[in-house]
Amino acid sequence: MNNIIKMLNEEQMKTDVPQFGAGDTVVVKVRVVEGGKERLQAFEGIVIAKRNRGVHSAFTVRKISNGEGVERAFQTHSPIISSIEVKRRGRVRRAKLYYLRERSGKSARIREKLATK
């Protein structure tokens, strides 16, 4: 029984998910159905939380839109996610960046992680 569940979970997992973590700026392309048409909508922001649980993995992205903070939680292996692109790597010392909710402007900035040679 346990092997069957494990096999089904592995079957549903995507293989094209890039490596990213809290502090990284990502662009998530989401499939949106409006009327009868399907289009891709980009959601760009900072990853403030990531949960690694196999097929149940999820992450939360936060962005500032018109001066208002917007957060959206995504299931990593969901079929509505078309692609995930990492724009920039952030250097942070926490796994969850919930403290960014209370901050704005310069205090909400995240240092960039420079690539090592």
UniProtKB/Swiss-Prot annotation:
Family annotation (NCBIfam families): rplS_bact
Listed Pfam families: Ribosomal_L19 (PF01245)
Superkingdom of this protein's organism: Bacteria
Role according to the record: This protein is located at the 30S-50S ribosomal subunit interface and may play a role in the structure and function of the aminoacyl-tRNA binding site.
GO MF: structural constituent of ribosome
Upper lineage: Bacteria, Pseudomonadati, Pseudomonadota, Gammaproteobacteria, Alteromonadales
PANTHER family linked: LARGE RIBOSOMAL SUBUNIT PROTEIN BL19M, RIBOSOMAL PROTEIN L19
Cellular component terms per the entry's GO annotation: cytosolic large ribosomal subunit
Taxonomic source organism: Shewanella pealeana (strain ATCC 700345 / ANG-SQ1)
Gene Ontology biological process: translation
Keywords (A to Z) from UniProt: Ribonucleoprotein, Ribosomal protein
Stated name of the protein: Large ribosomal subunit protein bL19
Family: Belongs to the bacterial ribosomal protein bL19 family.
